């Protein structure tokens, strides 16, 4: 069944939202991250998603103490991403109690290391974040979305699916933080070609209709801004996915 996955982005312990990954376009929310995650858990969320934007910019400043506190205090699965660049960082996060670690640019820039991580920690512990942008074809963006690679999305998926990959987080970066709706066509395409891969959709979720459109296509839908801005609640999202 498709799950709603509430998300928080954190900079120095503060809940924020960026538009299209731009640190200059930052909105700060006056929420305590632990209280917010507890609220989402109480509402029925079975998984939570956290982006460590401080650690993404500077791995030496990764918010490990806070992440460990969050992982221990919530009773549902927590997945964490944000500029993971090494095997040591993956291990540190898993040791903190994180259920899954999200890996992004490394999948494109260092496939050997990425495959080592998949093998060492197992496919259930790793999510590949494949942030895409539509050129003549869907290509994967790297370096916090600052540049498009020459790698086509479907070729990357083909490569990793043959190496045991189970979970991906796919963001259409033209949609992220814009509340313009999700790219259903993109997720349908991935699901048709790679039915055994669990897809987490991200970017642009603006209404319950978006959730409805993704039911049965994606294993999860990551929702950040729409929940923080009160467009709909976790309870409404769960009901929508159960009834659609």
From Swiss-Prot:
Major localisation: cytoplasm
Gene3D superfamilies in the record: Aldolase class I (3.20.20.70)
A GO molecular function held by the record: 1-(5-phosphoribosyl)-5-[(5-phosphoribosylamino)methylideneamino]imidazole-4-carboxamide isomerase activity
CDD domains named in the record: HisA
Alphabetical list of InterPro entries matching this protein: Aldolase_TIM, His_biosynth, HisA_bact_arch, Isoase_HisA-like, Isoase_HisA-like_bact, RibuloseP-bd_barrel
Keywords, sorted A to Z: Amino-acid biosynthesis, Cytoplasm, Histidine biosynthesis, Isomerase
One GO CC term, this protein: cytoplasm
Cysteine pairs bridged by disulfides in the record: none
Enzyme Commission designation: 5.3.1.16
Keyword Repeat: no
Keyword Cytoplasm appears in the UniProt entry: yes
Residue ranges of the TM segments: none
Pathway: Amino-acid biosynthesis; L-histidine biosynthesis; L-histidine from 5-phospho-alpha-D-ribose 1-diphosphate: step 4/9
Enzymatic reactions: 1-(5-phospho-beta-D-ribosyl)-5-[(5-phospho-beta-D-ribosylamino)methylideneamino]imidazole-4-carboxamide = 5-[(5-phospho-1-deoxy-D-ribulos-1-ylimino)methylamino]-1-(5-phospho-beta-D-ribosyl)imidazole-4-carboxamide
GO-annotated biological processes: L-histidine biosynthetic process; L-tryptophan biosynthetic process
Compartmental location: Cytoplasm
A family per Pfam: His_biosynth
Active site per database record: 9, 131
Entry-linked NCBIfam families: 1-(5-phosphoribosyl)-5-[(5-phosphoribosylamino)methylideneamino]imidazole-4-carboxamide isomerase
Family membership noted in the UniProt record: Belongs to the HisA/HisF family.
Protein name per its UniProtKB record: 1-(5-phosphoribosyl)-5-[(5-phosphoribosylamino)methylideneamino] imidazole-4-carboxamide isomerase
Organism of provenance: Campylobacter jejuni subsp. jejuni serotype O:6 (strain 81116 / NCTC 11828)
Lineage of the organism: Bacteria, Pseudomonadati, Campylobacterota, Epsilonproteobacteria, Campylobacterales
């Amino acid at each position: 069944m498709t799950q709603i996955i509430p998300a928080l982005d954190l900079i120095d312990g503060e809940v924020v939202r960026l538009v299209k990954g731009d640190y200059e376009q930052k909105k700060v929310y006056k929420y305590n991250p632990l209280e917010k995650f507890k609220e989402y858990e109480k509402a029925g969320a079975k998984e939570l998603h956290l982006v460590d934007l401080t650690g993404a910019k500077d791995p030496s400043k990764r918010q490990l103490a806070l992440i460990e506190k969050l992982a221990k205090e919530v009773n549902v699965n927590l997945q964490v991403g944000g500029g993971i660049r090494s095997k040591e960082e993956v291990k540190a996060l898993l040791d903190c109690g994180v259920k899954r670690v999200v890996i992004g640019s490394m999948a494109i820039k260092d496939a050997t290391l990425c495959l080592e991580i998949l093998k060492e920690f197992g496919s259930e512990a790793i999510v590949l974040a494949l942030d895409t942008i539509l050129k003549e074809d869907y290509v994967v963006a790297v370096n916090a979305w600052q540049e498009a690679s020459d790698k086509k999305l479907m070729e990357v998926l083909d490569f990793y699916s043959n190496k045991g990959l189970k979970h991906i987080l796919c963001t259409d970066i033209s949609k992220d933080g814009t509340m313009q709706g999700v790219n259903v066509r993109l997720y349908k395409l991935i699901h048709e070609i790679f039915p055994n891969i669990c897809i987490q959709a991200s970017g642009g979720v603006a209404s319950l209709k978006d959730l409805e459109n993704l039911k049965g296509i994606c294993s999860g839908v990551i929702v950040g801004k729409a929940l923080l801005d009160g467009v709909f609640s976790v309870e409404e999202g769960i009901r929508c996915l159960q009834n659609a």
